[in-house]
A protein has these predicted regions:
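Generic preference for hydrophobic/aromatic residues in regular secondary structure cores
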Residues: 19, 154, 192-195
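Metallo-beta-lactamase
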Residues: 183-195
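Residues that form generic nucleotide/phosphate-binding pockets
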Residues: 21-22, 82, 189
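Short glycine- and acidic-rich boundary segments immediately preceding or forming the N-terminal edge
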Residues: 1-24
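Core catalytic region of metal-dependent phosphoesterases/phosphodiesterases
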Residues: 34-53, 61-186
């Protein structure tokens, strides 16, 4: 499947080159091997989902009867709180489990994109600037998680959401070729390739 996708990307722009580079490494299924068999230590692996943040989609209080508010500053605060909560939860579970692996699933729809005409007016950043914003914030969060020296292995499955598409409608055969989040994930992979 990845080989076919790589062939499909063979003719294309710099964007496709980055995607091809990210897909060039063979797909290896991550393995979490039990390490404690005789000592009686119980092992645990946290599974954390990050998705549907829609960071650039502003919610103005006056448009929602003053019941909510959301903007880029709040998005940054929530992202920081998310990563802090992950570290806190891992620390709490260490009273019961030996935790050496962590699965952080990046589930997509981190951005809203310009799927609808009013998104052009309501979103605080255009799509490419949102990618730069998200990349910077996700890198900060991942570096924060990497400070936990007891975690030996981070497994980060990634999938794109429907909002990151660059086409009017979803395309099943070429979905990843038209996904801004696949580009974002490729950039993250390149950034953390040696971590």
């Amino acid at each position: 499947k990845n080989a076919r996708l790589a062939e499909d990307l063979a003719s294309g722009s710099e964007y496709n080159e980055i995607i091809k580079a990210a897909l060039s490494t063979p797909l290896q299924r991550p393995r979490i091997a039990p390490r404690e068999r005789k000592s009686g230590i119980r092992e645990g692996t946290p599974l954390v989902l990050a998705s549907d943040w829609h960071v650039e989609e502003e919610v103005k209080p006056e448009r929602v009867a003053y019941r909510n508010r959301y903007n880029l500053d709040i998005a940054v605060q929530r992202m920081q709180r998310f990563f802090e909560a992950v570290r806190w939860a891992v620390r709490q579970q260490r009273d019961t489990f030996k935790i050496r692996d962590l699965i952080l699933w990046l589930g997509g729809d981190f951005l809203t994109n310009f799927l609808h005409e009013d998104d052009v007016e309501n979103n605080q950043l255009p799509p490419l600037e949102v990618l730069l914003f998200l990349q910077a914030e996700l890198v900060k969060g991942l570096l924060f998680l990497l400070e936990d020296e007891e975690i030996e292995q981070y497994i980060i499955p990634m999938n794109d959401g429907n909002h990151s598409r660059t086409t009017k409608k979803m395309r099943h055969a070429t979905r990843t070729q038209h996904s801004l989040e696949v580009f974002l994930y490729a950039q993250l992979k390149l950034r953390f390739i040696n971590e």
